[in-house]
């Protein structure tokens, strides 16, 4: 066939994600361990699922009253409402004043895709986006593809081994966009908060929060997102990607909400109407299963309580693992203080190792973790904790004095 | 509060879709009928669902062996494979030669969103898109938002009351993109096909097929998409949006595939790799439920057979409704030939009324249908067929001589 291909100029795209996981999978060593799974693992190394979810899946499948019609473009309204109440608390100022709203989004990136499209059109002056380094790969790509300049930042101070929100003040130019994850881990004082807020306002920085694991930090749903209320009370307008897949264990049904907080209801309706237009072009009608499971649980007090308890159990287990790791390192006499392990909240925290130590673990011990040593602590269990802590000890000893 | 809103310049977006449905809903007349639902209706006016689907939903919810982990970026591989086999037939040339592939997409617009993004980047010369008028609203918006010039066309010849594929030849400028639905309804002769193909090649027109109801035209899955094989055999490269929600009755789980046919495997892999990159930014991991239900049915011969039979039953019912409408109009002595009703395949077909007649039905009879008189015949049932046919008769008589 002599026809020239239409696709002649299309090169093979570079793979962006999963190189660490790929190397892990190709490793034939039986001792190999992967410490960077995105989702929480059970003690048996399976993805964690809230006990209430399988029950709800069954109940939904057996319900003859459900209809399987298309959802409207803005998605499942009861899902959006229940999720916003979860995020802000039922009686929050923005809910009472009717100036918070949300659009049902698809997948882990959906809310960022939608929000970025909006910002590209309606905030032409904001073309630089700062993204926390741990999320640069999935979210950065979204903004990059649309022509934004993407820079990364980290709250983690690898010298002081603690979180530091001052990076926000130092790095951000005027009119930039900031994608912010769990800022409550930074433990700011009242006056530090005030300085931060003033600086953000002064620089006209647009905040795009990323709440993908509400409740997984402290085990307390309200406490985890309390800082959002503070921003609301200070008159900030912002976007927030609220993802609920991780906290229910419905990873296969990536579902979320692009939350919009505006100064008043009129502005909110304008923003939502533009978002709806974009959603229509993106996927028209979002799939329902994830939203249906979550809504059924959130709207039933008994099931909601069961879910909260399962989440609490997960967080207690994370704390226990961290305590054990710290204790084992202490018993091994590993140089350094390991308090930073238990000082950090949530499933994903920094081990506080340097690059040489990480390399040592990967190459000599077949323990796979990212270069910044931010690991998923739920990947550590009774079967592998001794091997992991002994290996960390070896890594630290072998690289002593190399800094 | 004196702060100026970030969203100050954002106007309220115009609503694009559903104005007919909205007017219908606001109509308080008890006789009102809506003839333009997107999905097939049962004789009781409920959305049609294949009998095999509820069973499969239950089976999936009860299966303890399933894992709920994230799907990879390219989606569920077994779903893509099973769907491609359905589209092309197991032993088709493109499958054997390994030059067809697909990406699991989300919602009814997902495949067009993904395909349009690709074409925007990799076919910079193709900036005009022709879309069949019945699908202009959902798909046109996708291309329009990305800066393409969108024009509409229709195979329906409202004078001759038949389908005419020659519009493709007349209207299309060089290097344009054509979104094509069910071309097999045009009943082209071998020589007309040959002329059409030569002209498309000569004008370097890129084809983007829309297969959203395979099997619903003739009741025969292979026959409905046979024309795709003809394009393949003639050395065409193309995209195809394959949507399976309508043919299974899983409207709430909008799921599909962006199908790519390339001249060889190497080209295919390049295109798929670029699509994967775009998918990552769009939704990262697609939701699984719709794909899981469909794959479980397609990969089980007994269930597949049950699904095919349910589809056949649906198509037979559509034909029966059309026959009845034609017969009732004949008995009423309605002027004109109504053969075009039964000459057209599928649930959605043209009634062949002019604008005055449509207006008459909407305003005087509370029967809601689009201006081009393309209706969903499954909205007609034993309860409303007499009222509908009598009203059509009145409409035709009352506007006689107005043309």
Predicted regions and their residues:
Chain A
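Conserved PLP-binding catalytic core of the aspartate aminotransferase-like
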Residues: 306-364
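Hydrophobic beta-strand scaffold residues
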Residues: 35, 150, 207, 238, ...
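Glycine-centered flexible beta-alpha turn that most often forms the glycine-rich phosphate-binding loop
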Residues: 210
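N-terminal "arm"/small-domain region of PLP-dependent enzymes with the aminotransferase-like
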Residues: 2-85, 89, 281, 287, ...
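Eukaryotic N-terminal low-complexity, Ser/Thr- and Lys/Arg-rich leader segments
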Residues: 1-13, 309, 397-403
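Conserved core of the PLP fold type I
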Residues: 49, 54-204, 215-216, 221-229, ...
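Active-site PLP attachment segment
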Residues: 224-270, 274
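Structural signature of PLP-dependent enzymes
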Residues: 272-291, 297-326
């Amino acid at each position: 066939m002599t026809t020239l291909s239409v696709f002649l100029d299309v090169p093979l795209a570079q793979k962006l994600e999963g190189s660490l996981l790929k190397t892990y999978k190709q490793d034939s060593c039986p001792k190999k361990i992967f410490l960077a799974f995105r989702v929480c693992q059970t003690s048996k190394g399976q993805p964690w699922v809230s006990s209430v979810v399988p029950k709800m899946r069954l109940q939904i499948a057996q319900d003859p009253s459900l209809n399987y019609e298309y959802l409207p473009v803005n998605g499942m309204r009861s899902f959006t409402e229940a999720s916003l109440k979860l995020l802000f608390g039922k009686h929050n100022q923005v809910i009472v004043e009717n100036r918070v709203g949300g659009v049902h989004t698809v997948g882990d990136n959906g809310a960022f895709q939608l929000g970025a499209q909006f910002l590209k059109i309606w905030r032409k002056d904001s073309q630089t986006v700062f993204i926390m380094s741990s999320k640069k790969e999935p979210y950065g790509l979204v903004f990059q593809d649309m022509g934004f300049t993407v820079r990364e930042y980290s709250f983690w101070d690898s010298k002081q081994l603690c979180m530091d929100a001052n990076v926000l003040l130092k790095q951000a130019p005027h009119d930039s966009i900031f994608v912010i994850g769990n800022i409550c881990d930074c433990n700011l004082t009242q006056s530090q908060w005030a300085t931060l807020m003033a600086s953000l306002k002064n620089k006209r920085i647009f905040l795009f929060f990323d709440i993908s694991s509400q409740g997984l930090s402290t085990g307390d749903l309200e406490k985890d997102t309390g800082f959002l209320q503070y921003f609301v009370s200070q008159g900030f307008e912002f976007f927030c990607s609220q993802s609920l897949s991780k906290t229910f264990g419905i990873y296969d049904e990536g579902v979320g909400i692009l939350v919009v907080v505006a100064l008043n209801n009129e502005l909110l309706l304008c923003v939502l109407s533009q978002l709806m237009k974009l959603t229509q072009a993106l996927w028209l009608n979002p799939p329902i299963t994830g939203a249906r499971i979550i809504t059924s649980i959130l709207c039933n007090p008994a099931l909601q309580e069961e879910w909260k308890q399962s989440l609490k159990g997960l967080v207690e287990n994370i704390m226990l693992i961290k305590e054990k790791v710290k204790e084992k390192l202490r018993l091994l006499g590993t140089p350094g203080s390991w308090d930073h392990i238990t000082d950090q909240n949530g499933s994903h925290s920094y081990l506080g190792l340097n690059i040489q130590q990480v390399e040592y673990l990967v190459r000599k011990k077949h323990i796979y973790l990212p270069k910044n040593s931010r690991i998923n602590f739920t990947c550590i269990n009774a079967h592998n904790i001794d091997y992991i802590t002994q290996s960390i000890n070896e890594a630290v000893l072998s690289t002593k004095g190399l800094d």
